[in-house]
């Protein structure tokens, strides 16, 4: 099976160690060889990254060095898959726009903080096939997104929170897949804290998305 590299850190409010552990257990159960660390240095090790089949970054905000960013991006462009969730992948390294290009989106805001909202399945792709629309009680991410992403699920804003009424009716991608060079990239905005993965649909979408992104 594949070699999976999960690295966690950054803002602790997103429970990076716990959520990384959930992902590690999930992928280990699928037979993958999973390595978990809390440093970014291995991204700069070209020989190491060349044998990684899936990288899962769990780093809200924080900063990444030039060599580490270049190593990560080169690996994905060369065929290493990349998958992640919420701010751990799409609110990382805010000064690094090429990283954001690889991800396919960037967190902007979450009006109202923790709110009730619906996730709507938007594709018959195997990552979401057979999953019905479902409810979340968490942060509803408003994002800037790459229009070339293949959108798998969406959510619609009601414009009820924080006086941001002009977003009422906006349909926002929740999960997508894309390519970056030869690498497959999957992202889901679900997963603010570890208990968000107690929602079976949210966890299953993440499981399938990670498995899809692993280099064949």
How would you describe each model-predicted region?
Residues 99-106, 134-150, 191, 201-216:
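Oxidoreductase and adenylate-handling cofactor-binding alpha/beta cores
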């Amino acid at each position: 099976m594949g070699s999976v590299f999960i690295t966690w850190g950054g803002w602790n409010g997103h429970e990076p160690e716990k959520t990384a552990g959930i992902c590690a257990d999930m992928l280990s159960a699928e037979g993958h060889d999973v390595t978990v660390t809390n440093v970014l240095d291995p991204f700069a090790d070209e020989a190491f990254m060349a044998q990684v089949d899936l990288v899962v970054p769990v780093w809200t905000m924080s900063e990444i060095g030039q060599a580490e960013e270049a190593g990560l991006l080169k690996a994905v462009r060369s065929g290493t898959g990349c998958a992640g969730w919420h701010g751990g992948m799409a609110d990382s390294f805010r000064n690094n726009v090429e990283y954001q290009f690889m991800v396919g989106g960037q967190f902007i805001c979450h009006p109202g903080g923790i709110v009730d909202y619906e996730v709507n399945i938007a594709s018959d792709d195997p990552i979401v096939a057979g999953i019905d629309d479902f409810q979340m009680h968490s942060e509803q991410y408003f994002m800037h997104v790459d229009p070339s992403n293949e959108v798998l699920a969406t959510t619609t804003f009601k414009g009820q929170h924080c006086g941001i009424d002009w977003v009422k009716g906006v349909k926002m991608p929740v999960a997508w897949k894309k390519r970056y060079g030869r690498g497959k990239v999957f992202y889901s905005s679900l997963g603010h804290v570890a208990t968000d993965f107690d929602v079976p649909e949210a966890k299953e979408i993440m499981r399938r998305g990670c498995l899809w992104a692993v280099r064949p």
